[in-house]
From Swiss-Prot:
The keyword Cytoplasm applies. The coiled coil domain mediates homodimerization. GO terms for biological process: cytoplasmic microtubule organization; cytoskeleton-dependent intracellular transport; determination of adult lifespan; endocytosis. It comes from Drosophila sechellia (Fruit fly). Keywords: Coiled coil, Cytoplasm, Cytoskeleton, Developmental protein, Endocytosis, Endosome, Microtubule, Synapse. It comes from the Eukaryota. The gene is hook. The keyword Cell inner membrane does not apply. This is Protein hook. Residues 135-437, 480-574 form a coiled coil. It holds the Pfam family HOOK_N. One of its GO terms (cellular component) is synapse. Homodimer. Interacts with microtubules via its N-terminus. One of its GO terms (molecular function) is small GTPase binding.
Amino acid sequence: MSAPKNEMYYSLLEWFKTLNLNAPHADAESLADGVALAQALNQFAPESFTDAWLSKIKASAVGSNWRLRMSNLKKVTQSVYDYYSDVLNYSLSDFSKPDLQRIAEKCDLGELERLLQLVLGCAVNCAEKQSYITEIMCLEEELQANIMRALQELEATRQASTPEGGVASSLSRGSRTGLLDSKAVQEDRDALAQKCFETEKKMLLLIDEKTNLQQELHKLQQEFARLEQHSTVIGDDGVSLGPVQTGSVRYNELRRQLDLLKEELLQSEGAREDLKIKAQQQDTDLLHMQMRIEELMKSSAEVTTLKDEVDVLRESNDKLKICEAQLDTYKKKLEDYNDLKKQVKILEERSADYVQQNAQFEEDAKRYANTKGQVELFKKEIQDLHAKLDAESSKNVKLEFDNKNLEGKNLALQRAKDSLLKERDNLREAVDELKCGQLSSNTALTGTTVSRELQPSATVEKLQRLEAENKALREGQGGQTALAQLLDDANKRCENLREQLKTANERILSLSHASQSDDPILKESEFGKQIKQLMELNEQKTLQLEEAVTQSTSLQCKVTQLETNLSAREQEILVYDAKYRKCVEKAKEVIKSIDPRIASALDASVLEKSADLVEAEPKPKMSVMEEQLMTSAFYRLGVNAQRDAIDSKLAILMGSGQTFLARQRQSAPRKSLSAMKSK
């Protein structure tokens, strides 16, 4: 199974926390600046990761500056790679280099895992590796497993895993030691080849330097000869240096240069001699290594023979496993055969139970057939209720006609009331004219005659008295204050008279209305009582009809439930019958393989049982289903008709107290009574 995501990183972090460091190293952000990693490397190998190198790592003022983090991490990784190549002679070409930019910017856990993996390799391969290994062994088992897996991955990148690695567990001790020797020789050979390659590089460089020096010496000799031929030489500043003679300045300079070149030539020749000696030593080493390689080839041939033997043993082991698996399958088949026997017995018992249940269901169906009589009685009651509803609807039509007549009478009374109100308004206007006193005498006389005809005697006397007071006030020569007081008193009296006139008019109108409309009020009250009685009767009938409908629907629901139960039971019986037949067929096949005589006897018994089951199966009753569908359709039709009739009657009752135009504006009921009767 693959380890969870970043589990190895957290294990390496727990190991890194055990180190005694000055810099913080508890989480990914503290490790991203590279300071803690540099201190750990200095602690592991101070001879390689020196204090001078550690001082180059910027510990202060790093913060969130990813560029400084990047520079620190570059120094750390470069030093680690140099340590692996120079000190440990490990080649990390196959190991994926950690992405330092992602670590510096985002603190990526996967890249930090790779960097910590490299640091772990340095700790395990340093001089004090035993102490660090003991610290790792003190950790938890899960952490130890993850750390070992990290080391194995690092080792696998250093040297690719050989195909013999999977067989190493099944080899003998001799083969294991041979493999270890071959690995060690391979490592030595790689190291010597690397050293030979490096010495050859150095030798080529020295040869190039020697050729360059010889060329320069040849050039100098040519120039010296040329200068000796010329008598005068002009320097860089244009001054003649004179002939090259012993004791001159030019001669001394050239002599000094020649001595230097000779010394360099001697040094290069000494280096060449040293390289020759080293090359001879390496040739001898190569001869020894070739001898050892031949020995190892022989041991590898032995290892291949051992591998072949292991492959043969493995094939035999695989065959043994296949045989064991076949044996297990045969055992399971035998157990399945026993289980099938038990299931056949159980299915026989269940089939008997299902036959009994079918008989019970048939009896229940006969019982429910008796409920049909009750349903028919409910049908008759519903028809009677429909007839009563039709009679009540005809009565409601008659009452509506009477209501229209009463509305006509009410309109006539309303017109009379309007005429009386107009007369009252005329009287008010006459009173206002009297108050102002600005009309002519003729108009005053006509107004008084009209008021005398309409008003009672007490009001006439008051008006006469007020007119006399008015005349006296006009003829009098009192002050303005007295006139104002008299005018206020007159206004108050006029207002009192107005109120008295209002009360008198109201009494007159009420008396006239009572005298004219005694009989219509009684008729209206009687008509209202009749309407209320009819409404109560209608509500009672609707309640009775709803109760009957609910009873019929409940009975119908029970019938449908029983039908569904019957169909479900029949389906279950069919399913179990199919299973039973399959089990019987399997049992026959097994018994045929054991003894063919028993199989023929079983066929006969199974055929008899299947014939009995076919005879016991209930036959469908189409007539019962048709009757149930007819009754349900009739109930639905009756409910819809009843609802439409109630809606139409309610619409008629709602429109009885309104005018003809208001009734025409209202929405019609869903279906008329004629349509219901046609149904």
